[in-house]
Design a protein with these regions (language model features):
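A general "terminal functional-core" signal
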Residues: 1-186
Length: 186
C-alpha cells in the first residue's frame, strides 16, 4: 500500500555538521534539519537524537533557540568538531531543548543503554514530540576506523527500538550520517 512504519534516508554525504550558510565536516546539506524545520514551521514538535560519533554542531546551531525542536547528541569527546559540551543547553526560548552527552574514547553499549534508560528516553518523553528523527551515524561502531567508541550493531538496533517506541507509527525518520566501515554499515 506504499506505507511504512519507519522512513530511512540513505543519503550521502552526511549532513549534521552543515550550517545554513556553509558546508562543514564532509556535510553539504543538513538533511535532518531540513525535514525537522519544515515540520516545526507547521507547528509540530520534533526530537532529533543524533548518535553519530561526532557532535552534530550544525544541527545544534540551527535549533539552539527553537523551543519546538529538541536536539540530543551522544558523541565521543574530545573529537571533531570540538563542540557538544554538557553546558550547551540552548539559548533564549530554546533553553533546555539541547542535550549533549559526550563520552570518552572506549565507551561501549552498556553505557549507551544506561544513558538511554536514565536520561535520553525520559527527556524525549517529557518533550512529547510529534516526530522523532534519528541522525544515525554508525561511526561509533567498534570496527569504524575514524573514532574510538565500542558500539555494536545490536547496540544501534536497541537504541532505534527505544526511540521508535516514543512516537506513533509513521512518525520516526532515520537519516544516515557518518559511518566508514562498510561491513558495519551493511
Amino acid at each position: 500500500n506504499g506505507e511504512c512504519d519507519v522512513a530511512f534516508a540513505a543519503g550521502r554525504p552526511p549532513g549534521h555538521h552543515a550550517v545554513p550558510d556553509r558546508a562543514m565536516g564532509f556535510c553539504l546539506f543538513n538533511n535532518a534539519a531540513v525535514g525537522a524545520a519544515k515540520l516545526a514551521a507547521a507547528g509540530e514538535k520534533v526530537a532529533i537524537v543524533d548518535w553519530d560519533v561526532h557532535h552534530g554542531n550544525g544541527t545544534q546551531d540551527i535549533f539552539y533557540d527553537d523551543p519546538n525542536v529538541l536536539y540530543v547528541s551522544t558523541h565521543e569527546s574530545p573529537l571533531y568538531p570540538g563542540t557538544g559540551q554538557l553546558r550547551e543547553t540552548g539559548r533564549g526560548d530554546g533553553v533546555g531543548t539541547n542535550l549533549n552527552l559526550p563520552f570518552p574514547e572506549g565507551t561501549a553499549g552498556d553505557t549507551y543503554r544506561a544513558a538511554f534508560d536514565e536520561v535520553i528516553v525520559p527527556v524525549v518523553e517529557r518533550f512529547a514530540p510529534d516526530w522523532v528523527f534519528i541522525s544515525a551515524g554508525f561511526d561509533g561502531h567498534r570496527n569504524d576506523p575514524l573514532a574510538g567508541l565500542r558500539l555494536t550493531s545490536g547496540d544501534y538496533a536497541d537504541m532505534a527500538r527505544r526511540l521508535q517506541a516514543l512516537v506513533p507509527a509513521r512518525r520516526l525518520l532515520v537519516v544516515l550520517e557518518g559511518g566508514y566501515d562498510l561491513q558495519a554499515l551493511s
